[in-house]
C-alpha cells in the first residue's frame, strides 16, 4: 500500500516505521517544519520518503493526527484517512495492564494520584505524563526520560515488569486500554484550524476491552460515542474552609465515609476532580479503602502544579503546565479567592513553550485575571524574570511548558 503520514512531531515517524515493517510504501511529511534534520535522514536511510509538504499523488491510506487540518493535504488524493489514535489501535502490542487518561484539564494530576494510590497498595507502576516517564517509587515519580504524550508514544513505553502502566494522552488514545478515562470536557475547543472539536479526538480513547470512566455530568454527551460508561464525581467533598498553606479537611466516600486532612503544601482544592477520578479508578480495581485514604493524606501534589512555596519573604504559587489557559488560570484564582488569599497578589505569566502545541489566548486570560482584580505581568518568554514590587505578598506564577 501507498501510505501517507502527516506530522513528524507527534509520533508520525514511529507510525511510519510500523508501516514500513509491513511492506508499505511510506511517505512521511514534516507539516510543521520542526522535525530535526537528523531524524529525517534516519528515516530516509530506512527508505521512507520524507517531505516538507504533501507530495501530489494518490495514496491508499493517509494517517494524520486529528489536530491536523485536511487542508494540509493540498492536491493529494488521500484514500482512506485514519487518525494517529486509530493507527496506534492497529499496531500497539503492549499487553500490560494499562490505564489511559485524556481530557481538557487535570490529566497529569489524575495520573499522579492514580499512580501513587496503586503504588501504595503494593503494585509496581510505570507513569507516563507530560512531565516525563518513569516508575513510581516510594519517593514519588522517578522521571527517566522526557517524551511526548501523543498517542503514538503509547507504543514506546518503557519495558519492565509493571503491574500497571498509567498514561496521560493528549488527544485520543489507543482504544485498547484496560481502563480509559476522560477527566472532563470543560471546553470543547476547536482543533485543526477549527474544523474539528477536541471531543472528536478525545473520544478515540474509549476502549472496547475494558472500562470507560467519564465525569458524571458529561455522561449524556459521551454516551453518543460509548454506551458502557462508568460515571465519576462526588467522592470527595470539602468539610472545612480552605486556607492558604493549611491542608483542608475533606470527607471521602469510598466504601463508607471517612474524614481526611490533606497536605497543605499545594492547592489541594484544585485537585478535587483528579482525586474523584483516581478514587473511581482504584475502586474499580479493588484497591483497599485504608490504602487510598492514606495515599490522599500523604499526597503532596504534582511538582509545579499548584505548589505553595516561600521565596524572598513572600508566598509563591507556581503553576508549570502545558495546559495553562484562561480556564486553568481562572480555576487557580477561584481557589485562592475561596481562601481569601488574593489581597496583595500579583501574577507573572510566562508563555515559554517546550514542545507545547496549545497556544494561549492573551485576551481571554487578561479578561479572567481582570475579573479577579489581580495585576499581571507577561514575560517575553526569554527567561528574564520581571521585578516584583516589595508590597507583593503572594506571587502567582503561570509558566506554560511541558511535553505534548
Locate each region found by the language model:
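Short, basic phosphate-binding NTP loop
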Residues: 1-100, 121
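Adenine nucleotide phosphate-binding catalytic loops in nucleotide-utilizing enzymes
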Residues: 6, 196, 230-329
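Walker A (P-loop) phosphate-binding motif
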Residues: 86-132
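ATP-dependent carboxylate-amine ligase
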Residues: 1-35, 284-287, 294-302, 308-404
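Active-site regions of enzymes building and remodeling cell-envelope glycoconjugates
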Residues: 24-25, 38-52, 59-62, 75-83, ...
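Conserved substrate/cofactor phosphate-moiety recognition/catalytic segment
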Residues: 34, 125-155
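Short, charged/polar "capping" segments at the starts of alpha-helices
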Residues: 33-40, 68-74, 135, 219-225, ...
Amino acid at each position: 500500500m501507498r501510505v501517507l503520514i502527516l506530522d513528524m512531531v507527534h509520533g508520525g515517524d514511529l507510525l511510519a516505521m510500523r508501516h514500513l515493517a509491513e511492506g508499505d510504501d511510506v511517505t512521511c511529511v514534516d507539516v510543521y517544519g520542526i522535525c530535526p534534520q537528523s531524524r529525517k535522514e534516519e528515516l530516509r536511510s530506512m527508505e521512507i520518503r520524507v517531505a516538507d509538504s504533501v507530495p501530489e499523488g494518490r495514496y491508499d491510506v493517509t494517517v494524520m493526527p486529528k489536530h491536523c487540518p485536511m487542508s494540509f493535504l493540498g492536491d493529494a488524493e488521500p484514500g482512506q484517512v485514519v487518525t494517529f489514535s486509530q493507527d496506534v489501535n492497529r499496531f500497539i502490542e503492549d499487553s500490560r495492564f494499562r490505564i489511559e487518561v485524556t481530557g481538557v484539564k487535570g490529566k497529569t494530576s489524575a495520573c499522579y494520584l492514580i499512580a501513587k494510590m496503586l503504588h501504595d497498595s503494593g503494585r509496581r507502576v510505570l507513569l507516563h505524563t507530560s512531565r516525563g516517564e518513569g516508575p513510581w517509587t516510594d519517593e514519588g515519580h522517578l522521571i527517566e526520560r522526557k517524551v511526548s504524550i501523543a498517542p503514538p508514544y503509547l507504543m514506546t513505553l518503557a519495558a519492565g515488569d509493571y503491574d500497571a502502566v498509567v498514561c496521560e494522552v493528549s488527544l485520543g488514545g489507543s482504544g485498547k486500554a484496560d481502563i480509559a478515562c476522560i477527566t472532563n470536557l470543560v471546553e470543547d475547543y476547536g482543533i485543526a484550524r477549527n474544523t474539528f472539536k477536541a471531543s472528536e479526538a478525545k473520544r478515540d480513547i474509549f476502549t472496547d476491552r475494558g472500562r470507560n470512566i467519564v465525569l458524571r455530568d458529561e455522561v449524556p454527551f459521551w454516551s453518543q460515542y460509548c454506551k458502557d460508561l462508568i460515571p465519576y464525581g462526588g467522592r470527595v467533598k470539602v468539610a472545612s474552609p480552605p486556607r492558604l498553606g493549611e491542608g483542608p479537611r475533606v470527607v471521602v466516600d469510598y466504601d463508607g465515609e471517612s474524614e481526611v486532612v490533606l497536605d497543605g503544601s499545594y492547592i489541594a482544592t484544585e485537585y478535587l476532580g483528579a482525586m474523584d477520578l483516581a478514587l473511581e479508578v482504584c475502586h474499580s480495581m479493588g484497591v483497599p479503602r485504608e490504602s487510598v485514604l492514606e495515599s490522599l493524606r500523604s499526597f503532596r501534589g504534582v511538582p509545579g502544579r499548584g505548589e505553595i512555596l516561600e521565596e524572598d519573604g513572600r508566598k509563591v504559587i507556581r503553576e508549570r503546565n502545558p495546559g495553562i489557559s484562561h480556564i486553568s488560570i481562572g480555576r487557580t484564582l477561584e481557589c485562592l479567592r475561596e481562601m481569601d488569599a488574593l489581597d496583595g497578589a500579583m501574577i507573572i505569566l510566562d508563555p515559554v513553550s517546550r514542545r507545547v502545541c496549545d497556544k494561549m489566548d492573551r485576551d481571554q486570560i487578561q479578561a479572567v485575571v481582570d475579573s479577579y482584580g489581580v495585576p499581571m505581568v507577561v514575560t517575553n518568554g526569554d527567561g528574564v524574570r520581571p521585578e516584583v514590587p516589595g508590597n507583593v505578598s503572594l506571587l502567582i506564577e503561570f509558566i506554560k511548558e511541558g511535553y505534548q
